[in-house]
Amino acid sequence: MIRILHFSDLHLGTEAYGRIDPATGLSSRLADFLAAFDQVVDYALDNRVDLVLFCGDAYRSRDPGQTYQREFACRIKRLSAGKIPVFLLAGNHDLPNAVGRATSVEIFHTLEVENVTVANRPQSYRIETRKGLVQIIALPWLRRSALLSREDSKNLSFDEINQKLEDMLTQWLNSEIESLDPGLPAILAGHLSHSGAMPGSEKTMMVGRDYILLQGNIANPAFDYVALGHIHNTQTVDSPVPIVYPGSLQTIDFGDEGKEKGFYLVEIEESGDRGGEAAIL
């Protein structure tokens, strides 16, 4: 049985409803977010999970400050030092404003940090864990310009561009699914919206409309688990395959008030039988 800790949407750097500490110049909210992140790391280490899966949006800003980067890196280092594989998926807030610039999590790949895998583009991976290999098909957040040239999108409306992008991603995903080894656990990790999701506070942080994948296209029986990020409401979808948004780790704005925040611990049997335990912070 492989035990996977799934969390997303950390958004370090969110300062709403906090106050500035005059001694450090940092928002008091930073302590809240780091405390939540520490609980994730402590749980993973104390319970010796086999894989930590982060599904995007490490920071609030696409150009995070050095302090936020340091604090994020310190906690990823603890997991790495504990010999726990960490899979970091790029979200929309992890992408730079200009094409060609590095993502905010790319430094872990550049430095070849042990036990850390960074997924910046759609790709299939095989991650070695204590219990054996896990297959992950990664669908990080993608700019429209990354898949569609100006010529491709010429004279198309915004909705038509989104539809074309959705069709391309679905076609790619179906192709990758055909290459999965049915004898190994398989996970879809995505930072995206799907047609059955209930939006949350992420809507206040977006410009324009998300591209949306059909729920039926990601609820493929070839997967043991569909791990998602981007939607801040904690939610699971009733389907043959568990489709899970763990939600943001901390309250982002008043739209999150009264809602449970946390992460998921998922157990995947080699036979494909699944069971999950939600650990709410």
What positions do the PLM features span?
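N-terminal active-site segment of His-dependent metallophosphoesterases
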Residues: 1-75
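Active-site neighborhood of divalent metal-dependent phosphoester/pyrophosphate hydrolases
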Residues: 10-11, 49-67, 84-99, 192-211
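Metal-dependent catalytic neighborhoods of phosphoester/phosphodiester hydrolases
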Residues: 56-75, 90-113, 128, 200, ...
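A short C-terminal boundary segment appended to hydrolase-like catalytic domains
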Residues: 179, 268-281
